[in-house]
């Protein structure tokens, strides 16, 4: 479960970062 939770957190964090980069790219 710990490994799964870590993987989920990493994936979620990467998705958020990608969204932020995409938003920044569109804004600038």
Curated annotation (Swiss-Prot):
Primary location: cytoplasm
GO cellular component: cytoplasm
EC number: 2.5.1.18
Keyword Transferase: yes
Binding sites annotated in the UniProt record for glutathione: 7
Enzyme class label: transferase
Entry keyword set: Cytoplasm, Transferase
A GO molecular-function annotation: glutathione transferase activity
Source species, domain of life: Eukaryota
GST N-terminal domain residues: 1-28
Catalytic activity: RX + glutathione = an S-substituted glutathione + a halide anion + H(+)
Compartments in which it is found: Cytoplasm
Subunit structure: Homodimer.
Family to which the UniProt record says this protein belongs: Belongs to the GST superfamily. Sigma family.
Role summary: Conjugation of reduced glutathione to a wide number of exogenous and endogenous hydrophobic electrophiles.
Name recorded for this polypeptide: Glutathione S-transferase 5
Organism: Gallus gallus (Chicken)
